[in-house]
A protein has these predicted regions:
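A short glycine-rich, Lys/Arg-flanked "PGG" loop and its adjoining helix->strand segment in the class I
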Residues: 65-80
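Short, hinge-like loop/turn segments at secondary-structure boundaries
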Residues: 27-29, 99-101, 151-153
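Conserved catalytic/acceptor-binding region of the Class I
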Residues: 82-148, 160-165
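A short acidic, Gly/Pro-enriched loop at the edge of an enzyme's catalytic core
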Residues: 40-52
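A C-terminal cap/extension of S-adenosyl-L-methionine-dependent methyltransferases
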Residues: 153-184
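A short SAM/SAH-binding and catalytic strip from SAM-dependent methyltransferases
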Residues: 50-65
Length: 184
């Protein structure tokens, strides 16, 4: 509806698995084109999009400036860009022993290239000619780690990643156990 019958929505992701999921979710729409590409080389025409969005993606791209240049290239003059990213330095679990919790979180820092991208982004966009740059904080607090909770997923991702960064399995299991006990 947002782009009308003549408009096109482009979905860009380097992961075929993600695009397969998107294809299933969007199967009822005829004007969505999914592209298996990286954000730094969409192969879209210049000035072809009225808006572009990125949701928790740019912080994982080592050279985010190249991707921002690509976004700038494909946007029509006056086009809008919306980014949703987490301030990873402020993303924390609470309840576990402070030292152990910090060890897990410190290990997790290596999971993305730009821990604090929302703080860097306004200057980067301004240098590319963007106007009316605005920030909108989206705070969220999750108090339960049930099976459908983002916290449940994040805990598993952080635990597995910590193992790849030299944190012992015993420490990871202890951390997870402490989180579970803190919730009770």
């Amino acid at each position: 509806k947002a782009v009308g019958v003549a408009g096109t929505i482009y979905g860009l992701d380097p992961s075929k698995t993600q695009l397969d999921q998107a294809s299933k979710r969007c199967s009822e729409f005829e004007n969505i084109r999914l592209i298996e590409r990286n954000a730094d080389d969409s192969q879209l025409q210049s000035d072809c999009c009225h808006s572009a969005t990125s949701t928790q993606a740019l912080e994982y791209i080592p050279d985010v400036d190249i991707s921002l240049d690509e976004i700038t290239r494909i946007l029509k003059p006056g086009g809008a860009f919306v980014n949703v990213s987490i301030l990873w330095d402020h993303f924390k679990f609470h309840g576990a022993d402070h030292r152990l919790n910090e060890r897990i979180h410190e290990a997790f820092r290596a999971h993305c290239s730009h821990q604090m991208l929302p703080m860097e982004l306004p200057g980067k966009l301004e240098r590319r000619g963007f106007k009316n740059i605005q920030d909108q904080p989206l705070a969220f607090v999750i108090t339960r780690r049930d099976e459908n909770s983002p916290a449940h997923y994040s805990e598993a991702v952080m635990a597995n990643f910590a193992l790849t960064q030299g944190v012992s399995e015993a420490e990871v299991l202890d951390w997870k156990s402490q989180l579970e006990k803190a919730e009770q």
